[in-house]
Amino acid sequence: MSETLLSSRNLAFELYEVLDAEGLTQRERFAEHNRETFDAAISTARNIAEKYFAPHNRKNDENEPRYENGQAILIPEVKPAVDAFLEAGFLNAARSFEAGGMQLPTLLSQACFAHFQSANAASTSYPFLTMGAANLIESFGTEEQKQRFLQPMIDGRFFGTMALTEPHAGSSLSDIRTRAEPAADGSYRLKGNKIFISGGDHSLSENIVHMVLAKLPDAPAGVKGISLFIVPKFLVNEDGSLGARNDVLLAGLFHKMGWRGTTSTALNFGDNGNCVGYLVGKPHQGLSCMFQMMNEARIGVGMGAVMLGYAGYLYSLDYARERPQGRLPDSKDPSTAPVAIIQHADIKRMLLTQKAYVEGAFDLGLYAARLFDDTTTLQTDTERKQAHELLDLLTPIVKSWPSEFCLKANELAIQILGGHGYTREYPVEQYYRDNRLNPIHEGTHGIQSLDLLGRKLAQNGGAGLKQLIRLIAETGARAQKHPSLTALREPLEQLVNRLQSVTIGLLTDLAQGKVNSSLANSALYLKVFGHTVIGWRWLEQAIRAEEGLAKGEAADAAFYKGKLQAARYFLTWEVPSCHHELAILEARDDTCLGMQEEWF
């Protein structure tokens, strides 16, 4: 039977041959685990995803939430799926045993979550949003806030959201207008409007805890004047019981291109002047707090994009194997049977491109999860700091590269199915529509490119970048031991050398105040940087594949050869194409920057 969510063999390759998941069990936090417990968690995730989430993915899409009597109504299949997720303990997969969690490494929890993201992106979003909100309260909330709001979220009784966007302020959060007035009892009264709030209303939980950005009366201008508040749908009494309905109104639902099973809400806070909120962290420090949740969300968005690309790839692969059509160019006899389309060279090209994109991005997402484990469990402060610097640098890539190129994989999946791919009778068009959100939310490509080039590269004296260059060089040195990888290694080395030169020039210009010209083509820089990182990850996979082939296991030979062919494609087809973008960056080309509004 074909696998539809992800390749279990590829997952095992990543966990146990590339990323050394078993090595994490040597660390104190994960000492109670071993490969058997890891595999058991993955098996449980796969079973729940296949049984509860995948079956209603299409129904979710065809029956988006309805607005009735001030409430959002979902299809009935969503709640049992989410309940199964909660009952299996996945909401707290990475939390400690003492806190009621599985104490899994983030690497393993992300491997588990990947099955749900592939099976049903929309229904999966509800618990995922809750995890992010809970982590925020755990990091910055008071003990009272943790008891009143965090514990019910950990227990799965309360769900959470992230409420940032306003009708006039999307990426530009410094312009938000939601206000918070202090009240005599130490709480605050909020007034404002938020839009595009995923999970902003539903009946999946007893309560919904909104994490809301707002400004205090004395707030300084800009991002330094933003504060963070807990605003529950229902107030919570001191004994933990639910109190009165808070002054939070569901004003309406947005009707989206994809992710139709997730409520996208417009929320009004304080229409009646009595929206109660509680300050989280220090006044005017809300955005720095929220960035923790946003960075977690950005990594989650990247993995979500990967898995939608993965689902489309697997479906189109099965289709190509089963769909007979035409004959090979050298066949001159029309009486011969048609061949499966997978035998045609151009179909192979499209499948190989998908494989290179989704498996390269899958590796990167899991590598980022492994880095997150390193930030908390490596032995020394220095080691943990280095892991954090590298993860911080890579976060824009983890979010944006899969969002762009796994979406392209979805496009190729549609093309492989031809006319069938363009119909709603086949799932690949939904995968594309669902994935089209990922380049937009949690920071657009443009925002990610500015973050990378304008902030992350030079952060801490370029510590993260120096680490990355060193790691790529170490991989290249190991690849030199495999002469068959020379043709794969050399294009990456050439790209890294030129990228370093371009980066130094751009950072020098930025330091000299040439901000507009330096950042004008940041989107091109993001693409090249991302291809460099993915190229590095593919060279790592190629080394492991060579080592696997050397063991002589016949059953694995096709798998490893497929890895090497995908690495060959990416490193010899995709990586060299980046030199065109680098030439534009080197020239500080102002074609786009110099375009005037009235010329359009």
Regions found by a protein language model. Name each.
Residues 1-124, 148, 583-584, 590-600:
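Amphipathic, small/basic residue-rich leader segments at the start of a protein or domain
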Residues 2-5, 10, 182, 259, ...:
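Alpha-helix capping/hinge segments and adjacent helical runs
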Residues 99, 459, 474-600:
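C-terminal amphipathic alpha-helical interaction region
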Residues 126-130, 141-183, 193, 369-388, ...:
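Internal maturation/activation junctions in enzymes
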Residues 133, 142-145, 149, 444, ...:
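A structural-propensity feature for long, helix-poor, extended segments
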Residues 187, 191-245:
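A short core secondary-structure module
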Residues 196-198, 235-251, 256, 266-297, ...:
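A glycine-rich, basic-preceded beta-loop-alpha segment at the flavin cofactor/substrate interface
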Residues 359-398, 504-520, 541-558:
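C-terminal helix-coil-helix/basic helical segment that borders enzyme active sites and/or dimer interfaces
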